[in-house]
Amino acid sequence: MLYYALVFLVVALVAGALGFGGIAGASAGIAQILFFVFLALLVISLIASAIRKA
C-alpha cells in the first residue's frame, strides 16, 4: 500500500510540475487537485503503516 502511495505521489508531482510550469496550462487545476489528493493518500498510508508496526 505504501508503494502505491509513493507511485501516485510521483505521478502527482510530475502532473503538478507540468501543470504549474505552464506546459499544460489548461490542466493546472486538475494537477493541483491530484497533487493534494495523492499527498493525502501518502500521509494516510504512512500513518497506517506506522500503526501496523506498533
Curated annotation (Swiss-Prot):
Keywords: Cell membrane, Membrane, Transmembrane, Transmembrane helix. The keyword Membrane applies. Its main location: membrane. It is found in: Cell membrane. It is a multi-pass membrane protein. Signal peptide: none annotated. It comes from the Bacteria. The chain crosses the membrane at residues 5-25, 29-48. One of its GO terms (cellular component) is plasma membrane. NCBIfam families: PRK13682.1-1, PRK13682.1-3, PRK13682.1-4. Belongs to the UPF0391 family. HAMAP family: UPF0391. This is UPF0391 membrane protein Oant_1245. It comes from Brucella anthropi (strain ATCC 49188 / DSM 6882 / CCUG 24695 / JCM 21032 / LMG 3331 / NBRC 15819 / NCTC 12168 / Alc 37) (Ochrobactrum anthropi).
